[in-house]
Amino acid sequence: MKRTTMSQPEAATLFIAASEHDSNLYYATRFMAPDPFIYLEIKGERLMVMSDLEMDRARTQASVDRVLSYSEIEQKAKKQGIKDPTAVDIVHVVLKESKIRRLSVPANFPVIHAARLQERGYSLKPKRDPFYEQRVMKTADEVRHIEDAQRATEEAVAAAHALLRRAEIKDEQLWLDGEVVTSERIKKFVNVKLMERDCIAQHTIVAGGEQACDPHNEGSGPLPAHRSIIFDVFPRSATSRYFADMSRTVIRGKVSQE
């Protein structure tokens, strides 16, 4: 006798996050926001719940089916007897009509929201990155965005290397235009070059000598001659939000046989 299996109840996808910091949310909405907002996928429909401040921009820029007003849903929640509605109360009001009680959430979903949803009877299933598996396979446009960021990085690093070539060697240190060449000076140069190409760099590494042997030491102080100088540059495009990554080891002076 063939055994029949019960199908799982339908689940909705839920994010409560800021897309500026959450790549999965930005991927889903193509909307950049510095403050957390609610994003739901309910029975194939993609929804955002936005503050009045962001409503018009979201409706113009976001790649979703509908943008709902947070304040309007908040008023609806108050009429239902909720004195001070939280983000979870807003989610509950939106989900009420769909009768969905199961939620798929990202692994970094805030614990406070998860606890409040569970108190309301929702079942949550966290999903590891990448939340959207299709992110692994890049489209032609995504490849182009990554290439653009990488080219900008290569140009900035090449320009920094040109500075080191111009530097003079005095007392085992590098000098340029009458000043000692420091890690800070070269990092600033690289970061400014990247900004000129609409890329934002953080924690750029230009580390020389013993600092170059210390993983993720960003480097500080004078850069040495005749010793390794590590470059590790990984900016993000301010326009496309895609990253580049480039590492190089250079020496200004004589290379040790060791």
Where are these regions (language model features)?
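Active-site neighborhoods and metal-handling regions in enzymes and metal-associated proteins
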Residues: 2-258
